[in-house]
Amino acid sequence: MKEQIAGFEVEHVHGPEEIPYKRDELVVLCLVRDGEPWVRSFIEHYFSLGAKHIVFLDNDSTDGIVSTASEYDNVTVLRSKLAFGAGVEGIVGERLMRRYLIERFGSNRWSLCVDIDELFDYPYSDVIGLDSLLRYLDSKSYTAVTAQMLDMFPEKLSVNSRQEPIKGLRDEYRFYDLSRIDRSRMRKDKDASRNNIIESDEVAVRVRGGIRDNVFGFKPLLTKYPLLFSDGTLEHISVHAVRNARVADLTCVLFHYKFYAFALEDYWYRAIEHKRGRGPFMNRRYEQYVEVLEKNTELQLKLESSREIASVNDLLENGFLVASEGYIGWVDAEEEKNIWQADPQSKPYELAAAFLESRRLARAKTLTVGRLERQLLEHRRQEQIKDQRINKLKEQRDSQGQKIQELKEQWLDRDQKIQRLQRKQQRLRKRNDRLKKQRANVAASRTWRLVEGLHRIKAKALDVRKR
């Protein structure tokens, strides 16, 4: 079956072209170019998570990702040469290809659209399966789930140091840092214009920053909507935006292994070159990557504020992820059901009940601690904003004081000039008075009268001659 995206042919390379699956089963969708270093970790993670099928849409790769992905069952590989940054009727090629995947494989069912360097996980995935998560979302009629990207990194990273893909990616890249994370409330008018329903204020938050702010000096937007139920009204605008969505009351995580690319020999440079042409904003960002990576052969990433990931649930307790009481109640009920189904003759009953109760209390505590952590961070953020405003007012006050001092000095200088002019004017008046007196004295003298008489005689003589 041949299909097209904006006039570009979609070639089928491997795996089934049609994928039947139930409402509580998940297909993973991935638009990828040159993703061979990640592909095995990617496939193994999502199958271990419980995904039914994985679909790759390869965008003209030059490495071996297509052949590597084609080694696996329950994997479909497609290929298109539509340019990543090409504009087609005002929509870039990247978005067109993602929409194609969602509309073709996710119609009236759940799909997870992620990048090759993103590994999705959700709160209490150690307790409930992926099918249970999807049933919970269906029970609430949700059509979109928010996920926050979390950059993972090793203690140290040597730029351009690796030629072969790493085997234990998650083991080596096990650190994260929340010290430069910024959270901001979503604008209600913007959500209204997109016709999204977000019932939870804790979910209606955009997250930016993180370790890339430390290293490269910019705050990337970390909030995405990867898990979608395409019901015919929901619209995928971009990885960071949806329209006509009913957004779930919990957030999930995308463990992000972008820093791994920087360790691969020349890989990061090729990837950046491929993504140029996406507009001046993105070009400036990629220039920042290049500038830092060309100057530093080694990046010291692990700081005092860095933490080692043990479980996705850690991110609930430290406030990075959120979940509602309704979701926690679902997890509690699923755990209880699973225990009794696994061993219906469990004895003594009191021990099992006590175990379940302790687990419930622990999850309730985690939820409370997470909320307190977010409140503390918000309080600190407000204090920082307050301090910034105070400092700005002080600067304005100092600036105004300096201007007042400058005006005083100008006024004083003007007064001094006026006084000098007044003194000069007084001197001129005195000199003028002296000259007047001198002239009067001269006019009154005998010599002056004699001179005037001679002038009169001379004038008469001239007059006689003329006659």
How would you describe each model-predicted region?
Residues 2, 90, 124-352:
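Catalytic-site signature of metal-activated, phosphate-bearing donor transferases
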Residues 1-44:
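N-proximal low-complexity "stem/linker" segments adjacent to membrane-targeting elements
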Residues 44-52:
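Short, acidic, metal-binding catalytic loop of nucleotide-sugar glycosyltransferases
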Residues 52-60, 80-81:
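Short beta-strand/loop segment that forms part of the nucleotide-sugar
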Residues 339-467:
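Boundary detector for helix-to-coil junctions that initiate low-complexity/charged tails
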Residues 66-113, 121-126:
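Active-site-proximal specificity loops/subdomain of glycosyltransferases
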Residues 30, 57-67:
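Ser/Thr-glycine-rich phosphate-binding loops at phosphate-binding pockets of nucleotides
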